[in-house]
Amino acid sequence: MAREPREGGRGGREREQGDDLVDKLVTINRVAKVVKGGRRFAFAALVVVGDQKGRVGYGAGKAREVPEAIRKATERAKRTMIRVPMKEGRTLHHDTFGHYGAGKVVVRAAEAGTGIIAGGPMRAVFESLGVNDVVAKSLGTRNPHNMIKATFAALEKASSPRHVASRRGKKAAELFGKREQGQTEAEVTNG
């Protein structure tokens, strides 16, 4: 009897969706509900979905069968997708911090060639997001649900220089002090 090839690896199970979305199964747990006649078992799944171009979402689903729990989690993840601005399509624009419950996450932008240095559930989020270079550290909890929610809290704080400039009513060039052609350094500092 031939076995099907096992899916998995460091990022969990990965499937391509029809609409260019990649979903990663982060965790699956067997949970029990105690009823009069004994225990009723179900499965809880946690899934991360992303387009690898700056959009990512997560969802949890619970059902009596594993495939149904994964399907529910995937549907919820698609509905909760957020857009994260990326620098050069490979990393974040700046370092950020997020927390949820006891979970704290520090996410740092990294130079090209660094790779994804992140543990467990955070790695699945960054791979689905399309980030190639990032350093992330989880503090305070190892619970995958809280770790992912803290990671999303950090990613929601991320913004692009253009967005920051528009909030301040300036241009991105003004924000970074880029000189216009012909200006000397003294003219830039004197305003």
From Swiss-Prot:
Region (Disordered): 161-191
Gene3D superfamilies per UniProt: 3.30.160.20, 3.30.230.10
Record-annotated membrane-spanning stretches: none
UniProt-listed GO biological process terms: translation
Biased composition (Basic and acidic residues): 171-182
Cited Pfam families: Ribosomal_S5, Ribosomal_S5_C
PROSITE patterns: RIBOSOMAL_S5, S5_DSRBD
GO MF entries: rRNA binding; structural constituent of ribosome
The keyword ATP-binding appears for this protein: no
Residues covered by the S5 DRBM domain: 21-84
Source superkingdom: Bacteria
KW RNA-binding (keyword) present: yes
A Gene Ontology term for the protein's cellular component: small ribosomal subunit
Record keywords: Ribonucleoprotein, Ribosomal protein, RNA-binding, rRNA-binding
Entry similarity comment: Belongs to the universal ribosomal protein uS5 family.
Quaternary structure and interacting proteins, as annotated: Part of the 30S ribosomal subunit. Contacts proteins S4 and S8.
Role noted for this protein: With S4 and S12 plays an important role in translational accuracy.
Record's comment describing the protein's domains: The N-terminal domain interacts with the head of the 30S subunit; the C-terminal domain interacts with the body and contacts protein S4. The interaction surface between S4 and S5 is involved in control of translational fidelity.
Protein name: Small ribosomal subunit protein uS5
Species this chain originates from: Gluconobacter oxydans (strain 621H) (Gluconobacter suboxydans)
Gene symbol of the encoding locus: rpsE
